[in-house]
Amino acid sequence: MGSSKSKPKDPSQRRRSLEPPDSTHHGGFPASQTPNKTAAPDTHRTPSRSFGTVATEPKLFGGFNTSDTVTSPQRAGALAGGVTTFVALYDYESRTETDLSFKKGERLQIVNNTEGDWWLAHSLTTGQTGYIPSNYVAPSDSIQAEEWYFGKITRRESERLLLNPENPRGTFLVRESETTKGAYCLSVSDFDNAKGLNVKHYKIRKLDSGGFYITSRTQFSSLQQLVAYYSKHADGLCHRLTNVCPTSKPQTQGLAKDAWEIPRESLRLEVKLGQGCFGEVWMGTWNGTTRVAIKTLKPGTMSPEAFLQEAQVMKKLRHEKLVQLYAVVSEEPIYIVTEYMSKGSLLDFLKGEMGKYLRLPQLVDMAAQIASGMAYVERMNYVHRDLRAANILVGENLVCKVADFGLARLIEDNEYTARQGAKFPIKWTAPEAALYGRFTIKSDVWSFGILLTELTTKGRVPYPGMVNREVLDQVERGYRMPCPPECPESLHDLMCQCWRKDPEERPTFEYLQAFLEDYFTSTEPQYQPGENL
């Protein structure tokens, strides 16, 4: 999808320039995570980075083929000068006999080339050689190697990280500016009695001579010098810089080098997390080393050949708000292996103990995260087909990710394919999709409007008191769900935009993301918490 700009007033046309596709994932279910990065199951809180690596095409498990890997776009520039020495940004524990364990701060020499998601490297500390995840390292002495540099994360994502109540005043990060190419932004947590915990953003401008400044009277030859100075003196900032913003370790891109079609024996199913019409979801371990989620499909649910073909597409979808597809067992019963999300499905989360404590700001933020993931799906010209709270997964710190995209198209069960059958999610489905099978990104937008009602009612089934057939008839006649109790009318208006009869008149996900991210500054600045919202 392009990024043509037009006035935000027309939501169906609004386009905003967002970061290019980088890390993305599929699948379905449980791990902690954070903005620009996915979180590993372990709980290390270390600064996140933003190095997107483009999907490679791993071969059958155990095979080696580097001919079809793709150079990481964000690293390519840094490596053009022949950089081969890198520094580890995080600890990494090897998962196979061919990869390399290392500790944060270790220096590593790249042996072959810096392409794809897994690089062959030699540790200058331990003297050992093996494959390393490329998003766990950065060129030595580069800005990317700094703990406080978070790269290409959005203003909203930086606020999500910095607004953690555990962060002291002055917690900070440096990121790329969203609005000025080549400039940076210093984001700092602050506190005052009027606003409470809040974040201030300072544009870091670049001098023609190569230096940097926030205010022209105080200039620095490097970002490192700028950070060191403001760590000692506030000098006009809201507070001096105190702590680097903590976040979780990112997910690796895939389980290991060439671990795509994996043997069933390499997986151990440990805790059953859920069960649906077409299979079960388990927490498990791959190769005795790595926490994963495993979706098992009942034999006959879909053709293994069709699934494998679709999975090749799904694994290339990488975004921090999509659950990452790690690997597959492609013979029946099909297993789908994904990152593990610790809090389970959004539907269960809303209906559970935590749901009672969620208020509109948290719910709107969760909706904005889902819209962000779907805006990426939109840009990639893909369609989800089954967007609802049951297919959104929740991690630590209310991180939400879209799961199970694309799978609905492959289901061969008659109770589903009839579209009016008992297993078909009719209450979430746009009328043109339910009646005529026209599934598009615009039918996903309709489903997102229904998902907004799930959020604002803490998991209530849509169209309460109505059966599927009745829903289809009533919606065709123009019926739309009323505004949920305590929900602002402005949010209900957004739902109704998603439910416009003409699919082309519905908003884009890009517009929905922008609207929801700015909701409490642009639309509802006077919001006051109520009993439930």
Swiss-Prot record:
Its main location: membrane. It catalyses: L-tyrosyl-[protein] + ATP = O-phospho-L-tyrosyl-[protein] + ADP + H(+). SUPFAM superfamilies: Protein kinase-like (PK-like), SH2 domain, SH3-domain. The keyword Cell inner membrane does not apply. PANTHER family: TYROSINE-PROTEIN KINASE. Forms a complex with polyoma virus middle T antigen. Interacts with AFAP-110. Interacts with GJA1 and PXN. This is Proto-oncogene tyrosine-protein kinase Src. It comes from Gallus gallus (Chicken).
